[in-house]
């Protein structure tokens, strides 16, 4: 078959060249309109701003509009909110409250063609988290805890040390007093017991130790004084 192999080799190059020329001459205006994925839900706190985006592959001439499906009324027609602001069709809701809850849907349309619609983003409005009584950073909290530990250690060590020194001083003082009492008790250590008994006999005099009170009248009884 004349010219068969050469024709087969030139066929892939021709197809690639035609595809490249069609992509260059047609440009983005002849491409199909499609949209990027959007987040399924968006959570904001009460009083904050909510930002919705509608990314798509269309040119700047595309018309982006936003619609809201009311919460609990999905069978009703969606509520028109207005056009998007930038090329991504961003919708900003300021100072969000509970009434802004619902599903937000964006529509992109080029000219008279049919529009493309996103799957929708559900807006959830929550109460702001309670602020702590002492709104401090982690570094400040760590420094406060360190200072508290030092103060507790000081309060535990200093009184205990003072009590130990006081107890030691009392023990030393009691030791000295006990030594003085021991010396006072030994003042008469060198006296003779016979001298002590002689002194006792002299103090008693010639009176007997016992009296015969049976032969005396009651008025004449004289008892020995100790």
UniProtKB/Swiss-Prot annotation:
Residue intervals on the Cytoplasmic side: 166-226
Residues bearing attached sugar chains per UniProt: 57, 63, 73, 88, 97, 112
Expression (tissue specificity): B-cells.
ITAM domain residues: 177-205
Phosphotyrosine, modified sites: 188, 199, 210
Record-linked CDD domains: Ig
Annotated signal sequence range: 1-32
The keyword Zinc belongs to this UniProt entry's keyword annotation: no
Transmembrane segments: 144-165
Origin: domain of life: Eukaryota
Listed GO CC annotations: B cell receptor complex; external side of plasma membrane; IgM B cell receptor complex; membrane raft; multivesicular body; plasma membrane
UniProt-listed SUPFAM superfamilies: Immunoglobulin
Post-translational modification: Phosphorylated on tyrosine, serine and threonine residues upon B-cell activation. Phosphorylation of tyrosine residues by Src-family kinases is an early and essential feature of the BCR signaling cascade. The phosphorylated tyrosines serve as docking sites for SH2-domain containing kinases, leading to their activation which in turn leads to phosphorylation of downstream targets. Phosphorylated by LYN. Phosphorylation of serine and threonine residues may prevent subsequent tyrosine phosphorylation. Arginine methylation in the ITAM domain may interfere with the binding of SYK. It promotes signals leading to B-cell differentiation.
Effect annotated for changing residue 197 to A: Increased phosphorylation of Y-188
InterPro entries: Ig-like_dom, Ig-like_dom_sf, Ig-like_fold, Ig_sub, Ig_sub2, Phos_immunorcpt_sig_ITAM
Membrane topology: Single-pass type I membrane protein
A Pfam family per the record: ITAM
Outcome when changing residue 209 to V: Increased phosphorylation of Y-188
Limits of the Ig-like C2-type domain: 33-116
S-S pairs: 54-106
Domain comment quoted from the record: The transmembrane helices of CD79A and CD79B chains and two IgM heavy chains assembly in a four-helix bundle structure that appears to be conserved among different BCR isotypes.
This protein's name: B-cell antigen receptor complex-associated protein alpha chain
Source organism (scientific name): Homo sapiens (Human)
């Amino acid at each position: 078959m004349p010219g068969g192999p050469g024709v087969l080799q030139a066929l892939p190059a021709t197809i690639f060249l035609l595809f490249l020329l069609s992509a260059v001459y047609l440009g983005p205006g002849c491409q199909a309109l499609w949209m990027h994925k959007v987040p399924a839900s968006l959570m904001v706190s009460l009083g904050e701003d909510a930002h919705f985006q509608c990314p798509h592959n269309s040119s700047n001439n595309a018309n982006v509009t936003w619609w809201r499906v009311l919460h609990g009324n999905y069978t009703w027609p969606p509520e028109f909110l207005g056009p998007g602001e930038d090329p991504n069709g961003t919708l900003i809701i300021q100072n969000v409250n509970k009434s802004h809850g619902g599903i937000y849907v964006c529509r992109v349309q080029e000219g008279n063609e049919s529009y493309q619609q996103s799957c929708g983003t559900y807006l959830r409005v929550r109460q702001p988290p309670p602020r702590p009584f002492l709104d401090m950073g982690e570094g400040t909290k760590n420094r406060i805890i360190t200072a508290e530990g030092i103060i507790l250690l000081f309060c535990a060590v200093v009184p205990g040390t003072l009590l130990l020194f006081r107890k030691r001083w009392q023990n030393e003082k009691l030791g000295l007093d006990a030594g003085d009492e021991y010396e006072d008790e030994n003042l008469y250590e060198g006296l003779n017991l016979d001298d002590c008994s002689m002194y006792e006999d002299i103090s008693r005099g010639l009176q007997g130790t016992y009296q015969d009170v049976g032969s005396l009248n009651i008025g004449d009884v004289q008892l020995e004084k100790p």
